[in-house]
């Protein structure tokens, strides 16, 4: 099998601290895989182990059907792009891009590769400049070009855009996506692994996303699946902005129908399709998850609504994000500005939860509860 396979990969430091716990992951040839997670989740450590910059304690890393545990970084056919660019300040852009090829192929081939990559990255006019004369975005494109000319089997990116301003990050993000598509279209090696803590980057760039927490894979899936079908409470909370509303509630009944109690805020009856997920669940409480776009604002006395008080309203231009207090619980609602709803902090309103879209999580372990058919 081509691509990259990680088999029970562990990282244990001499002091006994275990950073990675039995990582099993298969990355397909030509796939754009994103590693995402909070600071300290070991996503960069895992990337550096694939690159050969960090030793492996246990397990096996396979690249293109070859175990590379004992293979030097320069012989793994990977190219890494770092956050800090790592350019030689005394060399021109041209020489920075050509440096890794010097002495390995004819000058004509080196020149062709450098100029071709520079044209694709729109930096041909910068080839005779030095890094000190470039902007951050230009430096990052040079670093990317330096990786491209090597024609590696795998591109590794370690938070390469985090030093750039917001507008430039968007531009570079699109450029990386286009580069990946272009390499695939030309039949060139295009497997990419991208590390970020920014979930927007993860959701917009990755074919699949690997979510990590404390050195353990929480879920590997397509972006849309992670958003709509999180495997556990951690993924539900981490993916999505604003974050999913998560609240521990008591399982009860209301007129004989399964319901959830929000203590002083009242009860909400569960739709039959959602209530079916509780079959076999024996705990008295459960964690309810609901996305902000599935929290609907209505009047304070509306039937089936939770009484709430507006705390803060974020006017985003195209949408409104409303933070509310519901008997001591924090809820966030999100809706288009075109609806014309306006309110002030302190106003009493009602929140209707679209429970058909609810997620239910085990109160003890945080695992999602799914219907028996799933």
Model-derived regions: residue spans:
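The feature captures the beta-strand-to-loop junction immediately N-terminal to the Walker
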Residues: 36-38
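ABC ATPase nucleotide-binding domains
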Residues: 77, 87-234
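ABC ATPase nucleotide-binding domain helices that frame the ATP-binding cleft
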Residues: 44-47, 142
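Helix-to-loop junction immediately C-terminal to a conserved catalytic motif
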Residues: 51
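ATP-binding/catalytic-site motifs of ATP-hydrolyzing domains
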Residues: 60, 66-67, 216
């Amino acid at each position: 099998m081509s691509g990259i396979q990680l088999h029970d990969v562990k990282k244990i430091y001499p002091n006994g601290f275990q950073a990675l716990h039995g990582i099993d992951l298969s990355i397909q040839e030509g796939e754009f895989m994103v590693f995402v997670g909070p600071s300290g989740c070991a996503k960069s450590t895992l990337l550096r182990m694939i690159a050969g910059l960090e030793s492996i304690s246990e397990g096996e890393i396979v690249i293109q059907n070859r175990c590379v545990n004992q293979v030097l970084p320069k012989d793994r056919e990977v190219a890494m792009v770092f956050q800090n660019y790592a350019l030689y300040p005394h060399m021109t852009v041209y020489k920075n891009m050509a440096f890794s090829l010097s002495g390995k192929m004819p000058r004509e081939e080196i020149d062709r590769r450098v100029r071709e990559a520079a044209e694709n990255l729109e930096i041909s006019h910068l080839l005779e400049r030095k890094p000190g004369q470039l902007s951050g975005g230009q430096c990052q494109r040079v670093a990317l070009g330096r990786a491209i000319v090597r024609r590696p089997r795998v591109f590794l990116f370690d938070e390469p855009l985090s030093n750039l301003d917001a507008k430039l990050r968007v531009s570079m993000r699109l450029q990386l996506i286009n580069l990946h598509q272009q390499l695939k279209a030309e039949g060139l090696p295009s497997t990419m692994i991208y590390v970020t803590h920014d979930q927007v980057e993860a959701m917009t760039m990755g074919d699949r996303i690997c979510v990590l927490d404390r050195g353990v894979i929480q879920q590997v899936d397509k972006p849309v699946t992670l958003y709509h079908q999180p495997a556990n409470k951690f993924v539900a909370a981490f993916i999505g902005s604003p974050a999913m509303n998560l609240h521990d509630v008591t399982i009860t009944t209301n007129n004989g129908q399964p319901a959830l109690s929000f203590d002083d805020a009242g009860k909400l009856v569960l739709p039959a399709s959602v209530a079916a997920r509780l079959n076999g669940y024996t705990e008295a409480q459960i964690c309810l998850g609901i996305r902000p776009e599935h929290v609907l604002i209505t009047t304070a006395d509306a039937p089936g609504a939770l009484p709430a008080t507006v705390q803060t309203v974020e006017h985003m231009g195209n949408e409104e994000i409303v933070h509310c207090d519901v008997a001591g619980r924090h809820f966030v609602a999100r809706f288009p500005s075109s609806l014309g709803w306006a309110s002030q902090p302190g106003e009493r309103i009602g929140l209707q939860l679209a429970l058909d879209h609810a997620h239910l999580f085990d109160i003890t372990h945080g695992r999602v509860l799914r219907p028996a058919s799933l």
